[in-house]
């Protein structure tokens, strides 16, 4: 008898992603590059490490840069994670033929624990606790803007429910409260009472659905996401719900809307085409709606937009093109042109 040994190939523990896109803002530069690095089980404990870096390509007087680290480690029904990030920007604007600069930075560190409470074949219920420290500095020329430069310590508690039926569902419900720990700003020190509050209370919910099917032999994939937020307090900008963004209501790039109270509903329909081509072709359509209010008593803003896109995938390369058109212009918004967005990515 003979014993024959064959080597088993295993997937690489490392992952490297490279990308370029034009998703940046007009003030800091549209064109950006991005690098992401991932490592599975660096301590051989089923843990994971992810690093990401992004920068604008113009390298002139305007820029936007960010980097982040995420590490997680499971232990039975528990998962512990650490997140840290740094971002900075510089944006010029002109008044009476003179050029001035807005600039700033944001540093964040958070620790989080998740615990699975119950699960069966089609459901999983978990709870989470998080403590985050956020430090923001904003400047006009070299003058620090105190109201726009909060230092916050935020505690959060939430529950997550994941379940399967004819679709895949995920529900997150979360409560956040600002604390006075670690040198955070104190509301008691404010002379004015209408300033953004560091010791705020905030409620958030997020419901996501993924559904697949076929129509006349054509497969389709529908993703729908509803995000809502409520706070009785005036919130710092970093804690507000953002209504205008490529991850919120698409189609608004020159104007922005955010607030303590609001909701965003995003819908994307994908139609993967059946073909013998080496390139996978997936057209898509999108329809988004949003509603935000900066604070109690403020005027609300309603947002809506439609989009059409195309994803081309070949081996480890993806090209994504998106056309976005806003369907209404809220009060105070300048008229928005239609938007073309492009992303090119390589995964190694």
What is each model feature region?
Residues 14-16, 43-49, 76-82, 90, ...:
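Repeated loop/turn-to-beta-strand initiation elements of outer-membrane beta-barrel proteins
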Residues 23-27, 54-60, 87-96, 104, ...:
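Sequence/structural signature of outer-membrane beta-barrel proteins
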Residues 37, 111, 207, 310-317, ...:
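Outer-membrane beta-barrel "beta-signal"
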């Amino acid at each position: 008898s003979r014993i024959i040994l064959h080597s088993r190939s295993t997937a690489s523990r490392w992952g490297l992603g490279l990308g370029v896109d034009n998703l940046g803002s007009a003030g800091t530069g549209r064109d950006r590059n991005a690098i992401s690095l991932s490592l599975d089980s660096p301590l051989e404990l089923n843990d994971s490490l992810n690093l990401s870096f992004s920068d604008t390509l113009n390298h002139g007087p305007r820029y936007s840069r960010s980097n982040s680290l995420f590490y997680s480690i499971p232990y039975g029904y528990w998962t512990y994670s650490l997140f840290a990030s740094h971002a900075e920007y510089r944006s010029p604007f002109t008044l009476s033929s003179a050029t001035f600069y807005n600039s700033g930075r944001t540093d964040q560190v958070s620790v989080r624990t998740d615990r699975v409470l119950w699960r069966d074949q089609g459901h999983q219920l978990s709870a989470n606790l998080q403590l985050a420290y956020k430090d923001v500095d904003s400047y006009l020329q070299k003058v620090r803007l105190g109201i726009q430069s909060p230092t916050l310590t935020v505690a959060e508690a939430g529950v997550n429910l994941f379940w399967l039926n004819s679709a895949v569902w995920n529900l997150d419900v979360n409560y956040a409260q600002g604390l006075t720990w670690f040198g955070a700003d104190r509301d008691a020190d404010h002379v004015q009472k209408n300033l953004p509050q560091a010791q705020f209370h905030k409620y958030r919910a997020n419901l996501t659905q993924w559904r697949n099917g076929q129509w006349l032999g054509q497969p389709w994939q529908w993703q729908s996401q509803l995000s809502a937020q409520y706070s009785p307090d005036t919130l710092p900008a970093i804690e507000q719900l953002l209504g205008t963004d490529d991850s919120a209501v698409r189609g608004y790039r020159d104007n922005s809307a955010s607030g303590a109270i609001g909701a965003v509903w995003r819908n994307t329909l994908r139609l993967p085409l059946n073909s013998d081509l080496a390139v996978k072709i997936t057209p898509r359509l999108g329809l988004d709606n949003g509603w935000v209010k900066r604070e109690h008593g403020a005027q609300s803003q309603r947002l809506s937009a439609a989009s059409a896109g195309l994803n081309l995938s070949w081996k480890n390369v993806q090209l994504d093109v998106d056309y976005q058109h806003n369907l209404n212009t809220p009060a105070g918004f300048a008229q928005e042109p239609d938007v073309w967005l492009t992303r090119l990515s390589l995964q190694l």
